[in-house]
Amino acid sequence: MAVRPLSASARVWSSSVSETGKSSQGQDQKHENYQNHQQSSLAGIVIKSALFATVVYGATMFIATKNDKVMDFVIDQQIPYYEETIDLIENGSYDDLVSAIKAKISSIRLPSKDEITELSHKIEHTSEDLLKETKRKLESARAEFGSHSTAGSGTSASLPANQLQKHPEIEHVKKEVEHLPAIKLNENVVSYVDASVKATIDSFNDLINSIDVSKVTPTDEGLIKTINEKVSELASKVGALSKKFDDELQSKLKVSQTELLSSYTKKELELTENLLHQFNRERAQLESKLNERLKQEIAATKETISQAAVNAVSMVRIEQTKNFEKLVADKINEERNGKLANLEKLNSRLESLEQFAESLESQVVATQQKSVIQKSLSSLKAVLFVSNPEEKPQSIKPYVDDLFESSPDDEVIQLALGELGPLLSKESTQSILTTSQLLTRWEQLVPELRSASLLPPNAGLLGHLASIVFSKFLVSVKGDKPDGKDIESVIGRVEASLVRDELDVAVEEVANLKGWTRKLANDWVIEGRKRLEAEYLVELIDAETRIL
């Protein structure tokens, strides 16, 4: 009788056991990595969320201090601690902010990191103990099942000769795996369970799903039931702790809210009092400014009204004056057309008479001015041309100034006086020589001219002595010789001209001399020309006054 080997079923069972062990080890490693990842990701999310919320809160409060719309939104939504934060931004400092945050944080009692870590480790250790206990019981059950299967096969299967003579038969078994019920939490506890606890429960459920129901003994089922109860109890404790933590947090928040409300009310009362005080002060200032401005406007209005009244009265007066003038003009026109019909003729005669009176007045004024000029000119002539050597010399300038003041705005007279003034400004009544005085000086100059005419060129002392001696033998010429070029002829013509009162001819003759004779007669020529210029200018003024 051939014995059917059980090696295939054994191999299937061993492979399932090995797969179960590998899967359990993989599940343990996966569960551990998942817990570490969950812890790190949860801490990172909490920190990032806190930082983001802090930045958004601070930016909103800062913008509210600059924008009225954002401030209205903050007040309407009653954002927590918005008054303290805005007051700190506007009036506070960094130290005040730190102290306020420390005070608020110290008033709230939260579980420490050590407590949370200890709770997480306790849950992890409990889960690991349960997992190890489950593995141990599964391995013992598998060992018992292997011993029972090998005992029935006996000695025939264990003999190597029989096993070599028999060909192994392979049995194809269709494996239908049933799973144990998963661990489920109570609905009242789910909302309070931490994420790490939920992850642990999910890991247990994965482990339970990997176990084949057909290979589980009643002992294993009891163990799984115990694990389920312990996990549910642990989740309930965690939920209770979370609920207790939330209750304590809510109580702390209520206390903080009450304190905040009281501080808010106190701050509101202080701000209201300050605003009322500031409002009263601003109102007093505005009232004083308004009263002062009203006084200024009233004064300006009074001045404007008075000026307008004065202008109106002036306009009325002007209008009445125009009406009166128009009435008088109309009345005069009526009288002119009636009783005063010959008034136009009388008016023309009066105009002609007025023109005659004006011309007569101008002639009288011109005659009077002419007489004044003639009088001043006569005084100047008397001083210039009629000089008494016995009288005391007088300056001629006052006479010239008197003539200048009395002269009209005539261009010729003004030019003549302009030349006469500088000429006679430094002269006196005795400095302008008359014709007789010039003749006397000429006679005194004649001997020197005669001796100078006999000097040779570059004459020395002997030449001067010889000229003096020989000049005594010269015969004087009397009369006028127009064609004579010698010195005696010139002397005769000059004397004849001075006797005839022809000073201009005599001066011209002397001015035409050459050499030493001209140099000796230079002073006489200057005096003669001064006399001639004065006579010419005075005669020019006299002639111009006659034709005025």
From Swiss-Prot:
Residues annotated as transit peptide in the record: 1-13
GO biological process: cristae formation
GO cellular component, one term: MICOS complex
Coiled-coil intervals, chain numbering: 265-370
UniProt topological domain (Mitochondrial matrix) ranges: 14-42
Any single Pfam family the record assigns to this protein: Mitofilin
Membrane topology label: Single-pass membrane protein
Main location: mitochondrion
Residues in the Mitochondrial intermembrane compartment per record: 64-548
Regions that span the bilayer: 43-63
Subcellular location, record wording: Mitochondrion inner membrane
Renumbered residue ranges of the record's region Disordered: 14-35
Record key words, sorted: Coiled coil, Membrane, Mitochondrion, Mitochondrion inner membrane, Transit peptide, Transmembrane, Transmembrane helix
Family, as annotated: Belongs to the MICOS complex subunit Mic60 family.
Assembly behavior: Component of the mitochondrial contact site and cristae organizing system (MICOS) complex.
Annotated function: Component of the MICOS complex, a large protein complex of the mitochondrial inner membrane that plays crucial roles in the maintenance of crista junctions, inner membrane architecture, and formation of contact sites to the outer membrane. Plays a role in keeping cristae membranes connected to the inner boundary membrane. Also promotes protein import via the mitochondrial intermembrane space assembly (MIA) pathway.
Protein name: MICOS complex subunit MIC60
Native source organism of the sequence: Scheffersomyces stipitis (strain ATCC 58785 / CBS 6054 / NBRC 10063 / NRRL Y-11545) (Yeast)
Gene: MIC60
